[in-house]
């Protein structure tokens, strides 16, 4: 089916702009450039037909071209209807790589785009690179006949990893998977430092609101929530956290944040950010108690955290201010400003995470694809992690760009600590 349409993007004439953006990003993505230097000659991904379902951004374009440089064939779709950067998609299409993504897809178009990535000229996909689990779920439910030919899955994000573990527990996961999200150089960098910058970018571009002096409510205090809370506090907001986990709640309290329930916080907040990866976080009962023109947004993967359906069914009026910014008039006379329709605000209203931090995440993705493709015997059906040594290698590949100088252990010190001078330096159970 995909032979009839080599790509589908919003505007192929944006390719030149996209290429310039890629050139800039490459200089900020030392990990991926290091992968090209190490593996372009040996082509460890030769024969791999990778179907990718991950936000079609400039940074993802650099990842795609890295996979191709390492020998893979690639077909791509975005994992969110609003996250595609159309100039990046155009640049990839112009380079001859099949991509099916544009900003503002309908749900039906979104599914169609994913389905275009399943068949290559030499046969169906044999590798999956996923973000959120939609591609993985589609193959397992609608195209199970393709499963036997798939060597592995690498999963990018917390939500997708939860999905893999749920599938494994139910006995329905049929393909080995690597949990990229919980590599230290992903979760402790992308989730934390990436969100710390891109959340504010999304809110500011959408509303131009003054954050200083406001009350911001952050639902969830995992790595994403921590980054969001730091950013909002840094801009002068008073931050309130909501949490279900006593450990995370205690962490938030020890950092000086007020921790309470959404039932209480909804009356205080001016800005609300959901980061939980769970459903039903902000409901109609909360909207009804919010202040006038409260800003509500989500930075978790799916649009299930905010009850947008309630707003659409119960608001007196909905006014679109500009793309991805809607103002709802409630029956009580107060207004709610909803960003990105409750989907990822940093990608719907801004450009997502900066290139440098995405280089960390995507270098892990490349290594995971190489591991699964070249060492299939090491990975039975299940959810696996990249070795600690590779995690450290990803970090080291990014140090030079920041002029970081590592201290080198002496042989005596290494023996004292019981580690190799070359690493890994921490046990697998170490919590960074």
Curated annotation (Swiss-Prot):
EC number: 3.13.2.1
Cystine pairs: none
Region (NAD binding): 183-350
Function summary: Catalyzes the hydrolysis of S-adenosyl-L-homocysteine to form adenosine and homocysteine. Binds copper ions.
Family: Belongs to the adenosylhomocysteinase family.
Subcellular location: Cytoplasm; Melanosome; Nucleus; Endoplasmic reticulum
GO terms assigned for molecular function: adenosylhomocysteinase activity; NAD binding
Phosphoserine: residues carrying this PTM: 183
NCBIfam families named in the record: ahcY (TIGR00936), PRK05476.2-3 (NF004005)
Cofactor: binding details: Binds 1 NAD(+) per subunit.
GO biological process: one-carbon metabolic process; S-adenosylmethionine cycle
Gene label: AHCY
Chemical reaction(s) catalysed: S-adenosyl-L-homocysteine + H2O = L-homocysteine + adenosine
Protein name: Adenosylhomocysteinase
Pathway: Amino-acid biosynthesis; L-homocysteine biosynthesis; L-homocysteine from S-adenosyl-L-homocysteine: step 1/1
Domain of life: Eukaryota
Residue sites binding substrate per the record: 57, 131, 156, 186, 190
Listed PROSITE patterns: ADOHCYASE_1, ADOHCYASE_2
UniProt keywords, alphabetically: Acetylation, Copper, Cytoplasm, Endoplasmic reticulum, Hydrolase, Hydroxylation, NAD, Nucleus, One-carbon metabolism, Phosphoprotein
The protein's enzyme class: hydrolase
Sites bearing N-acetylserine, chain numbering: 2
Cofactor: NAD(+)
